[in-house]
């Protein structure tokens, strides 16, 4: 598959019932610098002050501070990113961090007994790429895609019990299954070019560590679509789960009831 240049625009608007005195938000809205992904141009527009840094997982992040009264926050991230389709989903890692870091369960990916039983039917140690795709298919069969069925704080176990969820839940359940066997797996947040079909352009998938005859390293799998990552995907951040890779997380003082609207548009400029 040829390289794609993705045009991305991600708009987030927060509105508050009453004035907010102070807001602190962590933004992971700049695409990662990786082999096979290159930023051609990118900007983030918002009020307040931002301090940029690179976190322990190699993600670009901005700490946004609004230390004045406000009743809305507008955050717009946009630009062009050139993406190359990885060979068989393989993702050479430029961040010198042990994959064992991604074998530690979190609150969202804790492998409960129910998950262990499910995993035992669909996953084995030293699983191959095709076997991991089969696990993704089993997860999609067990947890049907339904927007609004879960919340950002929902655990993998909750999604499995409900039998429905979204890409975040599919990813968390896949990671939890890997944890049952000590297989490193990590959460990826980013964007997908939906093409000509209806699909949320903001997306989540996973990287999983494999050891095959000719390769030991990460491969990237879109659990929701049970396929390997291609050039249609732009990677924002990786982490142990949603909480450590979310595009926006924050706290505030005051404001009362909050409403949030999000609009994400992704397209291949060559299409």
Model-identified regions with their sequence ranges:
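Linear, non-domain "peripheral" regions
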Residues: 1-117, 182
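Generic structural hydrophobic/aromatic packing signal, biased to beta-strands
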Residues: 8, 27-29, 44-46, 77, ...
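Ser/Thr-centric signal marking residues that sit
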Residues: 12, 150, 224
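Residue-level preference for alpha-helix termini and adjacent loops
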Residues: 19-21, 26-28, 63-65, 101, ...
